[in-house]
Amino acid sequence: MSEIFEDKTENGKVRPWRERKIENVRYAEYLAILEFKRAHDVRGCGEVLRFRKIGEHLKLYQTWFCHKRLCPLCNWRRSMKNSSQLKQIIAEAVAREPKGRFLFLTLTVKNAHSAEELKVSLRALTKAFNKLTRYKKVTKNLLGYLRSTEITVNEQDGSYNQHLHVLLFVKSSYFKNSNNYLAQAEWAKLWQKALKVDYEPVVHVQAVKANKRKGTDSLQASAEETAKYEVKSADYMTADDERNLVVIKNLEYALAGTRQISYGGLLKQIKQDLKLEDVENGDLVHVGDEDYTKEQMEAAEEVVAKWDFNKQNYFIW
């Protein structure tokens, strides 16, 4: 009998390959029902995983990922890569501007109730954010930023709550006096102006403590919030198949041609200087979780895991 495959992190936590692959297969089934052309390709995502075993650690070195925006397997790998890149960028930003401070900003708009409305709203969000970062009150202390889009689905009415999470890197002078500092109410007014809407949108801003390891105001928590999934699979993998089909169809339409993450200012420059690839279109095999030399990888034992569609698990091959 074949051995069940298990991949653990250095601290002993089991990586969720099985859970993500089960969701991936279900997602592929939904795409097939909706008659999307690539449904069969999606089903083959991460079917065979090839690892190198170095000590007790497994390092993925070969597989095929479908790169679909809503694929739970690809989304998991993407969030890992985003997180890894962001850690490198933040470390370099602090080294270059040691007096710089971080803010975590959440910018919202009214919910969208259809695929078309969501698509239009996502474009408006990006356009308004670009305007916001050009306002004099913002630019005078802004060093750089990372902006990411998140969409949640309302359980009651099925509407879409699209919002931006922004990690702002600002000069220390931002906190010095009222001429530089922007209170939450001022951020809300500027965001309303950028959006060109007749209602006051909900905005939340807080200073982030770079040296604090845990808590919602820690830099790590803010970085993780910014680098996480665009849409949680739980929002389109509910017990209600009919609802899931509607949500997936709407999201596939609305997200086409959009980007989840963008960098600006110093953080964008650092990303270029570090030669970090574009996560949205890039390699999801190497996500920056571990770095080994070519010699180490070539000398290591190979471990191959293959997905069994009937038993719904990976087995050592």
UniProtKB/Swiss-Prot annotation:
GO molecular function, one term: DNA binding
Matching InterPro entries: Rep (IPR000989)
UniProt keyword terms in alphabetical order: DNA replication, Plasmid
Binding-site residues for DNA, renumbered to this chain: 229
GO terms (BP aspect): DNA replication
Described function: Produces a single-strand nick in a specific site of the plasmid, and this nick results in single-strand replication by rolling circle mechanism.
Family: Belongs to the Gram-positive plasmids replication protein type 1 family.
Name listed for the protein in its UniProt record: Protein rep
Organism per entry: Lactiplantibacillus plantarum
Origin organism lineage: Bacteria, Bacillati, Bacillota, Bacilli, Lactobacillales
